[in-house]
């Protein structure tokens, strides 16, 4: 049974879903005002791995991830570029999905846009006002955090301690520094929608609570995002649901942040943000997935030229093993090693212990190579297929095997036969033919190995 860490509880517990065999995930998605960076990539990979493993385990996954297509940052970027906010949102959303595709992330089953749920947001805000949990001011409608007795549950802090340490925008119109905007009254030249409080637009925290409840229903299974969203965003979502008397997420999951060299936090203000497009120019996109797998999802991850290079080298071992399986050809065993699979699943079920699971698979790669070298092809194939199946379950596919055409592999087999018959002139000619086609040839104890 899969156990996952629950942020609200502070420890791991068994995953029990609302409906047996089915799970609803709401993952806070992108605010589309700039190019996606490696921080976005990290959280996308974390939840892609979660979804894939759930599906591998037999679950039907309802994966909802929103697009915030109206926000202060989008408006700010539009003003900078002298464009309309919707132009900015459309442009950067397209970049987002292109980057996610390159990373190999599965598209969510539903992608709600904030601007498509304005009517529902107005209804929720009006209900909160009617309940006395929200109040109108000259610049908008605010939620009163004092309306929720356990405000601070996700942050594991009391309301008093949150108030004393509050780092929020100063606004003398609010009753408390922690009160947050549900509806923002329109400023000149800003997009707006009609409401009982005049023209305006929803606050960020209102958007996600409305979309998650609308698409997954009350008491949905899991709400996820980065650790930077625990407070205030997710705390504020939860507070609205509590005030409305609506069961909200049954479990909260948060991933660690990306760090630059030396543990320095990655941020735009420090000028150390690496966009995903820059990353893809520097490295195989699969290397970032492997790097993410080698780090526990709740731990910070350091992304440097060195860590990416190490991941590329490790990928080379996976690709080479896949190539050896293709070169072996005609091996009867079509199944993966069950011990490898069972050990992999056991580690993954322990709060997605991807570092432990990955270590098991790379040890299996080592053992498979030993078996290939010893000409134990069936055992080597069984281990290799186990490795490929398990890595495939978390979205990491080997390259190499499928890229070498059968005709080229046949040249290698002919070369092996020539060498066995001590026809070295023919073997050398076949080697030259393979090299001329753009492939490298290695002589191993198990025969000719061909690589790109």
Where are these regions (language model features)?
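Anion (oxyanion) recognition and catalysis
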Residues: 55, 129, 435
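Short Gly/Ser/Thr- and Asp/Glu-enriched loop/turn motifs at secondary-structure junctions
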Residues: 107, 137-138, 443-447
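N-terminal, positively charged nucleic-acid-binding surface of large information/translation enzymes
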Residues: 9, 18-104, 450
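Short phosphate-binding/catalytic loops that engage adenosine nucleotides
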Residues: 59, 133, 439
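Alpha-helical recognition segments enriched in aromatics with Gly/Pro capping
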Residues: 1-33, 48, 97-98, 119-326
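Phosphate-binding beta-loop-alpha motif at adenosine-nucleotide cofactor sites
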Residues: 109-116
């Amino acid at each position: 049974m899969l156990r996952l860490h629950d942020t609200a509880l502070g420890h791991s517990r068994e995953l029990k879903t609302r409906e047996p065999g089915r799970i609803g995930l709401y993952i806070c998605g992108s605010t589309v005002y700039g190019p996606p960076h490696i921080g976005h990539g990290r959280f996308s990979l974390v939840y892609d791995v979660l979804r894939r493993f759930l599906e591998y385990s037999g679950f039907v996954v309802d994966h909802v991830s929103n697009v915030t297509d109206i926000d202060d940052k989008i408006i700010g970027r539009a003003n900078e570029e002298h464009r309309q906010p919707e132009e900015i949102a459309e442009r950067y959303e397209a970049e987002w999905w292109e980057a996610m595709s390159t990373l190999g992330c599965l598209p969510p089953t539903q992608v709600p846009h904030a601007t498509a749920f304005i009517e529902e947001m107005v209804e929720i805000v009006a209900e909160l006002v009617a309940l006395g949990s929200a109040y109108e001011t000259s610049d908008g409608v605010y939620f009163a955090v004092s309306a929720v007795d356990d405000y601070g549950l996700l942050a594991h802090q009391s309301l008093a301690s949150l108030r004393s340490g509050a780092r929020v925008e100063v606004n003398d119109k609010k009753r408390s520094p922690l009160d947050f905007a549900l509806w923002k009254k329109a400023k000149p030249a800003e997009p707006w929608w009609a409401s009982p409080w005049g023209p305006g637009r929803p606050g960020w925290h209102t958007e996600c609570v409305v979309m998650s409840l609308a698409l997954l229903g009350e008491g949905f299974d899991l709400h996820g995002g980065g650790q930077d969203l625990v407070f205030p965003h997710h705390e504020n979502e939860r507070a609205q649901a509590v005030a409305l008397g609506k069961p909200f997420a049954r479990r909260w999951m948060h991933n660690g942040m990306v760090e630059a060299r030396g543990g320095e936090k990655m941020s735009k203000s420090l000028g150390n943000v690496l966009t995903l497009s820059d990353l893809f120019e520097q490295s195989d996109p699969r290397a970032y997935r492997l790097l993410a797998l080698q780090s526990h999802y709740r731990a910070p991850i350091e992304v440097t030229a060195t860590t990416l290079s190490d991941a590329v080298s490790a990928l080379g071992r996976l690709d080479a093993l896949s190539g050896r399986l293709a070169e072996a050809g005609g091996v009867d065993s079509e199944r993966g090693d069950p011990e490898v699979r069972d050990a992999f699943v056991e580690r993954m079920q322990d709060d997605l212990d991807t570092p432990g699971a990955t270590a098991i698979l790379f040890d299996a790669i080592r053992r498979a190579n030993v078996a290939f070298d010893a000409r134990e092809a069936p055992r080597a194939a069984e281990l290799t297929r186990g490795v490929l199946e398990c890595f495939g379950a978390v979205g990491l596919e080997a390259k190499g095997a499928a890229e070498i055409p059968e005709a080229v592999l046949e040249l290698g087999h002919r070369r092996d036969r020539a060498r066995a018959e001590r026809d070295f002139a023919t073997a050398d000619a076949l080697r030259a033919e393979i090299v001329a086609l753009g492939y490298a040839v290695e002589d191993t104890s198990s025969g000719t190995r061909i690589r790109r």
